[in-house]
Structure formats: structure tokens, C-alpha cells
């Protein structure tokens, strides 16, 4: 194919570079965590050919709607290899994902009510989205005047604890994880250091016993003078370790999107 013959606008996918990026991120995670996964953010670029490649490379699919959930299944992702986030879930796919072992992070009060539709004879796990006020936990990395996120439950005003208590009333449902995604202005290492510390503060304050922490996305890619995948992972690892978390017993989920593909296109 001659590049000069292509009509614009168009995107060109460098498959080799995409593979290289994924493998580099996985090597970084392998160097620190025995249990981890990369949940690629489908909304970043949902080209089926590329999604199939990412599935073959062992990535999970991070989806935020029933249409993305359906697309992930269509291109071959197993249901247990899906991370289901966001307030746009529908009831049918929400319950289907939980029943089949997906990582489902609750974002809304209605989703908690939907848990009552699960078969009481089986046990299930869910996560919950924490509403991050980046202006408070990492002000140097936030936009001016930035406050609470639009998503999840606030720890400061008691919403998070109330939501967790309601989940725990469902005797066959266990809270398995926390989701703490917030894209920052700087995409710095400091953001992830502060997010991890904030997560541990919540865990200790509420006495939670979790299976995973999902630290979200918002990373730089292979860009000059920017943190590398390894530096991000090392920061997450050291921050959890410093706060007394046994990282051998907890899965770490990352949700890169643009950082994997922006120089593959």
C-alpha cells in the first residue's frame, strides 16, 4: 500500500507497534505483580480487527455500555475477561456479566437494586466505583477548579459506605474490588501514587477485604520525556506496598486506551 494513495482523513494501524506496546506493559506488570490484567478501553478505538489482536495478546476488554459489551463478545473476548464499568449498563448485560465472572464495577444505585435479581443459590462478586475528587487527593495534577467526578460513589460524604452496606445486605454477593479511575491533567506518576494511597485509606477505614484494585487508565504512551509503562507500574507497586498491602494477594487491573494505540495509528 502506498501512503501517497490514501485519502484523508484516515488512521493507519501499526500492528507491530501495538503488539510491542502491549508486551512492554505486560512485562512491566509481570515484574511486580503475580496477578494482574490489562483491560483495554474499547471506547478509545473499537476497530474489530484491533480488538481481536488485543484479545489474542491476552488483554481484557474494558467496556462501558451494553453495545460495547456485545462487541467484546462478538470479537471473541470471554465474559470472564471483560471489565464492565460506567453508568450506561443495562440490566440484562449487567446481570449476565456478573453471572459469568466478569469484573463488574457498580456505578449507580439502580445497579445495587439489580443485584436482587441474581440467583440466591449462587455466589457472586462485584466491584464498586469510587468517586474521585482529584482536586483534593492530587491537586497539582488536577485542572483548576476540578472537583468530584460524575461517576461512582463519594467516600467523603458517606455515599460509598452506604452503597457498600447495601451490597453486603445481598448475602450471596461479595464486594471484590474498588475501581478508582480518573484521567488527570498531567498523567504523572504522582497521580497514581495518590490514587493508591487514597484506595488504601478507604480499605482501612471501611475494613474491606478485597480481591482486586482497578486503578483505571490515563497513562502516557511511548512519548519522549513522559513516564514509561514500567515507571507507572513501579509507582503503583511501591505505593501499595508502602501502605501495607500484600500485593501477592490482590489483583491489579489497569485500563489503558490511548497509551497503547496513539502511536500505533
Question: Over which residues does each language-model region extend?
Answer:
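A charged N-terminal "starter" segment
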Residues: 1-118, 122-124, 161, 165-174, ...
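Flexible, glycine/proline-enriched loop segments at strand-loop-helix junctions
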Residues: 9, 99-105, 145-155, 184-190
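Non-cysteine beta-strand/loop elements that form the S-adenosyl-L-methionine
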Residues: 64-67, 85-88, 125-141, 173-180, ...
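Metal-dependent enolase-superfamily TIM-barrel catalytic cores that perform enediolate-based chemistry
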Residues: 148-169, 191-199
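Short glycine/threonine-rich loop-to-helix capping motif typified by GTGT followed
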Residues: 186-194, 222-233, 264
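Alpha-helix-loop-beta-strand connector modules within alpha/beta enzyme cores
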Residues: 235-244
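Residue-level detector of conserved catalytic or cofactor/ligand-binding positions
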Residues: 258-265
Amino acid at each position: 500500500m502506498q501512503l501517497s494513495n490514501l485519502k484523508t482523513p484516515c488512521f493507519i494501524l501499526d500492528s507491530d507497534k501495538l503488539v510491542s506496546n502491549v508486551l512492554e506493559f505486560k512485562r512491566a506488570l509481570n515484574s511486580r505483580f503475580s496477578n494482574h490484567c490489562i483491560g483495554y478501553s474499547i471506547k478509545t478505538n473499537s476497530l474489530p480487527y484491533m480488538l481481536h489482536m488485543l484479545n489474542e495478546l491476552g488483554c481484557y476488554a474494558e467496556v462501558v455500555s451494553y453495545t460495547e459489551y456485545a462487541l467484546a463478545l462478538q470479537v471473541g473476548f470471554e465474559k470472564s475477561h471483560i471489565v464492565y464499568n460506567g453508568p450506561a449498563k443495562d440490566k440484562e448485560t449487567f446481570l449476565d456479566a456478573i453471572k459469568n465472572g466478569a469484573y463488574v464495577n457498580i456505578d449507580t444505585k439502580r445497579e445495587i437494586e439489580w443485584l436482587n435479581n441474581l440467583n440466591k443459590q449462587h455466589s457472586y462478586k462485584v466491584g464498586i466505583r469510587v468517586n474521585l475528587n482529584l482536586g483534593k487527593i492530587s491537586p497539582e495534577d488536577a485542572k483548576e477548579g476540578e472537583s468530584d467526578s460524575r461517576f461512582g460513589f463519594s467516600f467523603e460524604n458517606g455515599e460509598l459506605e452506604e452503597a457498600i452496606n447495601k451490597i453486603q445486605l445481598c448475602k450471596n454477593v461479595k464486594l471484590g474490588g474498588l475501581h478508582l479511575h480518573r484521567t488527570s491533567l498531567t498523567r504523572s506518576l504522582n497521580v497514581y501514587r495518590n490514587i493508591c494511597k487514597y484506595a488504601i485509606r478507604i480499605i482501612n477505614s471501611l475494613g474491606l477485604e478485597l480481591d482486586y484494585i482497578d486503578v483505571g487508565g490515563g497513562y502516557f504512551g511511548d512519548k519522549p520525556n513522559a513516564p514509561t509503562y514500567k515507571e507507572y507500574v513501579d509507582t503503583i507497586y511501591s505505593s501499595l506496598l508502602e501502605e501495607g498491602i500484600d500485593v501477592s494477594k490482590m489483583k491489579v487491573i489497569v485500563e489503558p486506551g490511548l497509551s497503547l494505540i496513539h502511536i500505533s495509528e
